[in-house]
């Protein structure tokens, strides 16, 4: 089992508003990526509030328990993080509009759960291919589902970054949680700073290379920046088959 995470401001943004972590607690793992928004320091604050709360809660417990316990733990912890961001905005009215996406994974010997809110992506690697698990909470995704836009039109739509759900944006902050089969080769989470620059095949080509896991992530950052690096880029990757 090898794992690694990385974050980079990209080539355009002055600040890095992403937060990322991987934590191990006994034989349980938490991976998470948060992509903050709101301008100035606000996005940075929102993503770090959410991720720090999640990480601290994970460190406090001896185990996430069974699958049902873990789902409840995720929803409860994410709801608390949402409330903390909301509380910050009330105390700092100038930061109104700040929020963050979040994608996370919990891996135990018995189950794998992946959750998301916003447009950061959660994938699994299976048969040396990337399979997207999460569904982006974006306006264009809703329009694709309703048949008003095609997948191709959505890729270049001027409002493709408009989120329908994010932490801090409302009182609820509910996360979608997916129960994923355990028999996967790896877990790959990232912010849209990567997926807006590289497609799934380009990402997988690097993950399949015979180089160290750290070098793979460095190479993905380099490639995304080479294509413009228009946003902050964050990745959390766990390879179950790499010893």
Regions found by a protein language model. Give the residues of each.
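PP2C/PPM-type serine/threonine phosphatase catalytic domain
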Residues: 1-243
